[in-house]
Amino acid sequence: MENTQRPSFDCEIRAKYRWFMTDSYVAAARLGSPARRTPRTRRYAMTPPAFFAVAYAINPWMDVTAPVDVQVAQAQWEHLHQTYLRLGHSVDLIEPISGLPDMVYTANGGFIAHDIAVVARFRFPERAGESRAYASWMSSVGYRPVTTRHVNEGQGDLLMVGERVLAGYGFRTDQRAHAEIAAVLGLPVVSLELVDPRFYHLDTALAVLDDHTIAYYPPAFSTAAQEQLSALFPDAIVVGSADAFVFGLNAVSDGLNVVLPVAAMGFAAQLRAAGFEPVGVDLSELLKGGGSVKCCTLEIHP
């Protein structure tokens, strides 16, 4: 069961992990000129936060006693929406539904690639109604939604890197769903165990920057998962705790421009050093529900 107490950011975090890299070490730029990065036009889906609220606590970031300003959430969300349009991307808008406050976290609704749409099967009953809403939307835009027998929480735990899917498990998505996803998509799936409930979805601890490059926060993963990531992505950007705990890795990249929480300043510097263009946005009101940029953004892969 997830710890629903609000996270503590004091020094006990450092003591908890035997494996720890200091932020100053992690943020050090690599020697040499950065690689040339090329943006690619993307298609996204988003759901306006018209009914956003923290009405229950199903992750450590949610505090039902903390007030939520829906108008601020809507303004921050709209800024993100306009940022994608300004960068040249297209955005499908999904109609929000009253009683489903977490629909704004559209990435969790499914996984779409190669004309195949897998609809989420949520772990918590509070979000079960979203599956029907997203399946209906998928059908309305021409897909035939595919369901899984086991829990999968969409792009919250399923991230595409080139022609490979990185798949998280440990808190939400059932590892047994990974084989189902691989069979449906016809793509290799790499299972990665998450071990810190504050990083309950893969997209809170790992960001895909282009078809060959990722950034991640190692302490969120098991030792075996860290070894897998190190072997698969030896040039990955390793992010420190200061940026991880403001959900800096809950980011969206088009291959050049990386939209990320504005508070993740160290990660932004790392991105610049690696040849990317960080684009900071403030989604602090939506972070109260345990989500940020990527959570609000479902990428529709071609």
UniProtKB/Swiss-Prot annotation:
SUPFAM superfamilies tied to this protein: Pentein
UniProt binding sites for substrate: 102, 127, 172
Catalytic activity: N(omega),N(omega)-dimethyl-L-arginine + H2O = dimethylamine + L-citrulline; N(omega)-methyl-L-arginine + H2O = L-citrulline + methylamine
Protein EC: 3.5.3.18
Top-level taxon of origin: Bacteria
Residues annotated as the enzyme's active site: 201, 295
GO terms assigned for molecular function: dimethylargininase activity
InterPro entries according to UniProt: DDAH-like
Keywords assigned by UniProt, alphabetized: Hydrolase
Gene3D superfamilies tied to this protein: L-arginine/glycine Amidinotransferase, Chain A (3.75.10.10)
Any Pfam family matching the protein: DDAH_eukar
Its biological purpose: Hydrolyzes N(G),N(G)-dimethyl-L-arginine (ADMA) and N(G)-monomethyl-L-arginine (MMA).
Sequence similarity: Belongs to the DDAH family.
Protein's name in the database: N(G),N(G)-dimethylarginine dimethylaminohydrolase
UniProt source species: Mycobacterium tuberculosis (strain ATCC 25618 / H37Rv)
